[in-house]
Amino acid sequence: QLTPPIPADNAAAGTTWKQWRKEFWGWGDTNASRIAAAEKYANAICDSIDKYGYDGFDIDAEPNFAQPFATDKELWTEQGVMPAFVKTLSKRIGPKSGTNKMLVVDGEPNALPDSLGDHFDYFILQAYTTTSDYELNDCLAVQINHFQNKMSAEEVAKKIIVCENFENYAAKGGVNFTTKWGTTIPSLLGMAYWQPTYDGKTYKKGGVGSYHMEYEYGQSSAQTTYPWLRKAVQIMNPSIK
């Protein structure tokens, strides 16, 4: 957590966490102050990445998803704030930074302005319980159509990582997925076999993943941990024998 605890004096005076958070980062009543606060927060994130040697940062972009907590979605609703946040991050992490630190967006990349697409290494899509290549191609098309004025279909496809929900489906590797050959396999493996197709052309994807990958640990013998993820890796990038 980047925001420090509420000072005792403030807490005694009745300051709420929401009030303190805005006060600490400088989020005031003006648009300029809010943009500055977002930039300050972005730099604090990058400072932590540098300090602890992290690989990068994942923005959960979910403005249209239901959330289990209260949120005012101010990064999304305040004009210019989200672009300022992303652009500040991208100076120190991501493909524009030259640092080999990753900047990825998870959830709804298409909720961001199309001008920000090339600021990210990957677009992570929560393609949970998809059952066919057709559904995955529909997910792909949403992103390609959104970014089409700034990025080619190939550039978008290369950033796409599709994920299954292992919080619910780790034991079976996902839900039943029907391949283009008509066979039924676990959806994570279907995602691994999937070749992104748009407007009749096939492209390379960024990869696949799983939400709560740790739930798969111990699903098989002690000699083979993470069996479904390992199989997915082998499908996409077979070991040299």
Features from the language model and the residues they span:
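Aromatic-rich peripheral "rim/lid" segments of glycoside hydrolase catalytic domains that contact
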Residues: E214-K241
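Solenoid-like repeat scaffolds
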Residues: W194-D199
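Chitinase-like catalytic core of GlcNAc-active glycosidases
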Residues: Q1-E164, N168-P186, G190, T202-K205, ...
